[in-house]
Amino acid sequence: MATGTVKWFNDAKGFGFITQDGGGEDVFCHHSAINMDGFRTLQEGQKVEFEVTRGPKGLQAQNVRSIP
């Protein structure tokens, strides 16, 4: 599992990007990859844990969850 910080997330469009703690390419995050009940969203600056996969347009986050 990778960790990072939410760079930005657009609720209206349902996606955003996560900056990895280890550096490297920012990771795309779609709302469907967020593990939480109710409305799936992330806040700028929020710390998260996630799996990284390579999608057709670059790195994608899967199984995203908030960490303290």
Swiss-Prot record:
Keywords assigned by UniProt, alphabetized: Activator, Cytoplasm, DNA-binding, Transcription, Transcription regulation
Sequence ranges assigned to domain CSD in this UniProt record: 4-64
SUPFAM superfamilies assigned: Nucleic acid-binding proteins
Predominant location category: cytoplasm
PROSITE patterns: CSD_1, CSD_2
GO cellular component: cytoplasm
Cellular location(s): Cytoplasm
GO molecular function: DNA binding
InterPro entries: Cold_shock_CspA, Cold_shock_domain, CSD, CSD_CS, CSP_DNA-bd, NA-bd_OB-fold
Protein name: Cold shock-like protein CspA
Species in which this protein is naturally found: Stigmatella aurantiaca (strain DW4/3-1)
Taxonomy of the source species: Bacteria, Pseudomonadati, Myxococcota, Myxococcia, Myxococcales
Gene: cspA
